[in-house]
Amino acid sequence: EAMQTVKPGKALDLGCGQGRNSLFLTQQGFDVTAVDQNELALEILQSIVEQEDLDMPVGLYDINSASIGQAYDFIVSTVVLMFLQADRIPEIIKNMQEKTTVGGYNLIVCAMDTEDYPCSVNFPFTFKEGELAYYYKDWDLVKYNENPGHLHRRDENGNRIQLRFATMLAKKIK
């Protein structure tokens, strides 16, 4: 859906895992850098990159360090922030924002903990209502919602765990 808005450019997949988003973005014409702190996932992605002869840097990176070095047109972090240190989230988001070019975009999807959908999973971090939107108050919120969704994880009865997710595509306007 974001591809209807975001034009190909230099992209960073922050917390890429095995590279589903990275590979998709590469197919869409983006110049992607894929980083994660999971070495096994990176090895799997690197083997795909080599098999497909793709020009995609894959690297080990601790997102908690909030030290993205170069600027990107598009920074993607989907279902990643909830696994990071809660006290580092403000710095991580600030670093993402600072390293996004003017006119560039951030795409974030993250679990929430709300009154109507309390988070039953012991994630290190979850957003509260309106919190992600507040971080991006000086950006153009192209898409923003806090809708219910399901995790792949299941509860003790075998049902997929339901909770709200903050989903945001924001454009840096200054």
Where are these regions (language model features)?
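Short catalytic micro-motifs in class I SAM-dependent methyltransferases
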Residues: V79-V80
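Class I (Rossmann-like) S-adenosyl-L-methionine-dependent methyltransferase catalytic domain
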Residues: E1-L12, G17-S67, L84, R88-E91, ...
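Short, charge-rich binding segments
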Residues: E98
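A conserved beta-strand element that flanks and buttresses the S-adenosyl-L-methionine
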Residues: V76
